[in-house]
Regions:
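Terminal transmembrane helical anchor/hairpin motif
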Residues: 1-10, 123, 128, 132-222
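Short helix-to-coil transition segments within interhelical loops
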Residues: 46-53
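Secretory targeting signals
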Residues: 1-34, 41, 58-125, 161-164, ...
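Short cytosolic juxtamembrane segments of multi-pass membrane proteins
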Residues: 225-236
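Transmembrane-helix signature of polytopic, membrane-embedded enzymes
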Residues: 42-43, 130
Length: 236
């Protein structure tokens, strides 16, 4: 069992702050403007003259966005774990193992967020506003309700994957033992210790992967069917 302060800080930073705030924000900033930014900067013409179909251009740009955001998430995760466990007595092999699992789960989450916000960017002009509202209402509010509606959120599946692969049980200085994740995420580990009512690990991976592919595919189709107009500068 890990010491409570380290586990609690790990949980607070890696599984509350980063997934609920930073991951959606990173994805929103990078993915929502894949096409809009090109239009506003009047650089989309340079992309459209290339001998590539629009759907393929969108997919290539989305893959580049996935790569960029995943690299950022990996760096953020590593720095977070170094800061948490730098002066602890936890073996670095255990820290590295935990960091690897956390980075893998959060990378899948940010890829899914990018796919969602990329689609939103094609459907709405005010994609940043809609993305913030989605993050606050859906991923912030609905995901924290002990109802089946939370199964429609990205963060729910990341939490289940984390709970099935990482140990959040902590022993406090007074000897009390608690599972910080189960309490905060409203998982009934007393009556359902195996979480039989929740998806299995690979089911969660499959759900998020399918969601990413579907959102990217729909966005690529929309990109193919849409005519993009660029404002030309007025002549004096």
């Amino acid at each position: 069992r890990a010491k409570a302060p380290g586990v609690f800080l790990d949980f607070l930073l890696s599984w509350v702050l980063i997934p609920q705030a930073l991951l959606p924000l990173i994805a929103l900033l990078y993915a929502s403007g894949i096409i809009q930014d090109e239009q506003e900067d009047q650089t989309i013409t340079y992309l459209l003259v290339r001998p590539l179909p629009k759907w393929l251009l969108y997919i290539v740009k989305m893959i580049a966005t996935w790569t960029t955001t995943v690299v950022l998430v990996l760096l953020l995760t590593v720095l977070t774990y170094v800061a948490i466990y730098a002066r602890s007595n936890v073996p670095w092999a255990d820290v590295a193992h935990r960091c690897f699992k956390t980075a893998a789960i959060q990378s899948l989450a940010v890829v899914t967020y990018c796919s969602i916000f990329g689609l939103v960017g094609l459907l709405a002009k005010r994609s940043l506003v809609i993305g913030v509202l989605y993050t606050v209402i859906v991923e912030g509010l609905l995901a924290n309700l002990p109802l089946s509606v939370r199964m429609g959120t990205v963060i729910y599946y990341t939490r289940i994957m984390a709970f099935r692969t990482l140990d959040f049980a902590a022993t406090w200085p007074n000897g009390d033992k608690t599972d910080v994740a189960a309490d905060v995420w409203m998982l009934d580990v007393v009556n359902d210790p195996q979480l039989a009512e929740h998806p299995r690990l690979w089911s969660c991976v499959l759900v998020l992967s399918i969601a990413s592919v579907v959102c990217t595919g729909v966005a690529a189709v929309l990109c193919t069917q849409r005519e993009f107009h660029v404002k030309t500068p007025e002549k004096d």
